[in-house]
Structures are given as C-alpha cells and as structure tokens.
Amino acid sequence: MSFLLLGATLASLGPSWANPAQNAVVTKSVANVYSSPSEDADVVSQAIFGTNVVPLEERDDWVKVRTPDEYTGWMPLAALRRLGPGGRLYAAAGRVAQVESLTANLYREPDVTKHQPLLTVPFETRLEVTAEPADHEGRWLQVLLPDDHPAWIQRGDVTFDTKPLTIKQTIELAERFLGVTYLWGGTSSFGYDCSGFTQMLVRRRGVTMPRDADAQAAWKGLAPVKRNKPKPGDLLFFGSSPDHISHSGMYIGRGKFIHDTPHGHPGVQISRLADQPWARLLVACRRLK
C-alpha cells in the first residue's frame, strides 16, 4: 500500500539527517527500532505512528534516532518523515485525539463501506484533529496525518481525555489487553514485550520510565518495596538475580500479577506469584514515588 510511505521519498528527505536540532515523525503504523542499521539486526524497540523522534546519525538508508523515552536505535528512512529545522512537532499542540481502542482504522472518507482503511494504527496513537462535523451523527473526526494528508477516524476509537489514570483504572486498562500477543521488542497493541507492556501501563499513569526491564528496576523514579508485601499497581521484576533482571509485570492484588510473557501461551496474561517459575524468579518489587 503506497499510502503507508505517506510521501516519504529519499528525494524529499534532504541531504542529511544527522542533526539533533531537527526532528522526524514516524509514518508507519509501527516502526521497528533495530540495534544496528540492518533488518537482520535485533529489534530492540518500536515507535508507533505519529511519534516524534530525534535523528542522531545517518547511514545509507538508515537513521539512528532517539525516541521520547530516550531509547536509541536504528530505523529505516522509509519509516520517517523529516520535520526540518525548527519544524513543528506532530500532534504536540492544538486539538489532539488519542486512540483508545486497541486498534483503529483511518479512512479517506467518513464511510467504512466505500474503501478499505488507509491504515490501521495502534492504541495510544496521537492524531491532529482538523474538523469535528456534526453530520454523520457526530461519529467521525477529520484528522491531519504526519504527511499533511487528511483522513477520517471514528470518534468512538479515540479520547480527548488523557489525564493520568488511577491504580484501579490502570489495572482495568491492563486487563483489556489480555490475550494480546507477545512480540519481542514490541511496544504497541499489535504486540508488546514484557517491559514494553509495563512501560505503557506506567505511562498511562502519567510517568515515562525506561524501556527495558533491568533499566526500569534500577530507575530512580521507582521506590523499593519488600517482595512479600506488594500492593496493586506495584511493578514486579524477575530474573536469575537482582543484577540479571529479564522480565517485568504489574501486581494486581490477591497474589496475582499481569504481564506479557513468551512462556506458556505467549501474550498478556494473569499469573499467580506463588506459582513457579515466578515465585523462584521474583527478585524485586518497585512502587512509583
């Protein structure tokens, strides 16, 4: 689907991206972030549609970027559009809708029957709203995409209320993702990995924490808690030792926690802390300060 490139051609990208004073925006539904400039490299993270990133280095058809959570890695040029020096960040001001459905379709017209969706975007995608017509029973919003093309989204798929969630609301949100597939390096509702899922839950509480589980456990924004006294909303960290953390989840009460795991039936699931291997591997418990 040529629309997925959203007008991002090499000719339009300019001679160099290696300028941290500039910004770029993701134009794919979800763009992989690689450990090195090759699709054969490990996928270490992702960035969703409309995410603003900072280009750090250019190499052939690749750009090293820094994402909003300070993660760095390599993305293909074709997944980005450069905003230019002093360019306006996408969906950073004005009337902005955020996708609240697990996924949402974008259309070229306010009609689901005439055309296939232009694009399917994940949970938390932010979109610039340009019109809220009263016709169509108020069901549709017109949005401006990062390539300056218009599109339409159904109002029921988005929210304008993005205030931080309570612990109870965060747990209710987490349970909406039960069964969503596990994806190594994933940070979207198309597939999370363990730390991508817990990072999203904490983000919805209004806090941006590091991307990886070991960095999360060491982060100063979390306070240590006794492992045998967790409270709902606390983060749990698992590994072979406190210095080798490889998994994370969120405690939801009554001896249970929710997490995204590749084990058993891979995906978001609820497990009991008393069960193995979790009881043996639990090495740290943390609480937002």
For each of these PLM feature ranges, what is it?
Residues 37-42, 106-116, 218-225:
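Short alpha-helix capping/helix-loop boundary micro-motifs
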Residues 182-196, 200-232:
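Catalytic cysteine-centered active-site loop
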Residues 16-22, 28, 38, 51-54, ...:
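Boundary regions of SH3-family modules and the immediately adjacent low-complexity/disordered segments
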Residues 112-114, 159, 223-227, 246, ...:
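Aromatic- and glycine-rich peptidoglycan recognition patches
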Residues 50, 122-127, 233:
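Loop/turn positions that initiate beta-strands
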Residues 1-12:
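Bacterial N-terminal signal peptides
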Residues 23-33, 93-107, 202-217, 252:
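Short, basic/aromatic beta-hairpin or loop at an interaction surface
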